[in-house]
Each structure stands twice: as C-alpha cells, then as structure tokens.
C-alpha cells in the first residue's frame, strides 16, 4: 500500500537522523518509496535498483504514476539490476539508507528469488553495504518473526513498525510491516 511504501522512507530516514543521505532502493514499484525519500529534503542521491527492464522502460516512458516527478529530480537515478545479488556481494559503495520493497514478504517471494537475503547471513552481507549509522529498511505485507530474529542478530538497533491502512476494495483494515535495522555509528 502506498502509505506503507512512503512510511518505509520516512521512518528509515528518521531512524538514521542525518542529512545529505545516499539512498539505495531495491525495487521501484510505483515509485512512492523513492519519491517519499526525496521529498524529505535529507537525501543527496537516490538510486533505484530494479530487476525488471520493463519497469525501467515504463519509468522512462512516463507510465509509472510518479515518472515525471522522479525523472526531473537530479538526485534520482534508476537502473536495471538485482538488488539482492548486489547486497550479497562485496560493497562497491556504502549507503546511508537501503530500502527493500521487492517481495510480498520474506515467506512470499516473487518469482524464484533466493530467500538468503532474509537470513542472518544475508542480512550480515547487506549490513556491509551500509555506512556507519546506516539503516536497512524492509517492507512486508505480513509479520515475520524469523526476519525480526535475524535482524536482531545482525543490527545494533532494530525497529518493527506496523502500518495499518483501509483496503477499500475489501472493506477491511490491513497491516503492512516495516523492519528496520541500524548499523552502529562510530560515535555512539
């Protein structure tokens, strides 16, 4: 839901607390996570890593709801790639904030995606891609005790945030879950 996609950025940036942030977003979706991060005024650069070339083409062709606003922002870049694969390898660069909104949940993954990202080992690898004081945020439509446990093994500070929203199509209140892990700052 777009409320929770925006909250993924907002809460992650609040948890970080810094400015001039370098942000990586795994998965473009409809662009709400990226746009919300840019709208805070605390982001210096934001890169979306999107595995589907069609989605990048839709963005470039103006078919994604926020295409025009994202494409005209000089801080924004989007490229084709596998965010999970990038985070599994050695870091070429370190980010202040990494926001992942790719799968429906750790247990309901899209396609044949390897689940290792959600494991302690996968999160340790992702942790290496964060600057000191950096934050990893993960979106899920369902609560995941196993993700919370793995994050508690890897990160110095973990925060789990439920985001409730009205689903008017089925006339129900639903809850999305946001998971945040913060890497210790040298000064803390």
Regions found by a protein language model. Give the residues of each.
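The AdoMet/dcAdoMet-binding core of the Class I SAM-like
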Residues: 2-132, 138-139, 144, 149, ...
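Core SAM-dependent methyltransferase catalytic element
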Residues: 153-188
């Amino acid at each position: 839901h777009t409320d929770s996609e925006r909250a993924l950025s907002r809460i992650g940036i609040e948890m970080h607390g810094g400015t001039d942030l370098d942000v990586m977003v795994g998965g473009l979706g409809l662009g709400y996570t990226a746009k919300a991060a840019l709208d805070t005024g605390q982001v210096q650069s934001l890169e979306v890593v999107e595995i589907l070339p069609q989605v990048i083409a839709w963005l470039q062709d103006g078919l994604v709801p926020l295409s025009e606003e994202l494409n005209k922002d000089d801080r924004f870049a989007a490229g084709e790639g596998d965010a999970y694969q990038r985070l599994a390898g050695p870091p070429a660069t370190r980010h202040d904030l990494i926001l992942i909104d790719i799968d429906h949940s750790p247990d309901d993954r899209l396609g044949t995606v390897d689940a290792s990202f959600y494991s302690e080992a996968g999160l340790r690898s992702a942790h290496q891609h964060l600057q000191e004081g950096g934050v990893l945020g993960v979106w899920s439509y369902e609560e995941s005790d196993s993700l919370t446990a793995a994050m508690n093994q890897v990160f110095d500070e973990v925060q789990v945030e439920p985001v409730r929203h009205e689903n008017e199509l089925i006339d129900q209140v639903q809850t999305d879950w946001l998971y945040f892990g913060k890497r210790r700052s040298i000064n803390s």
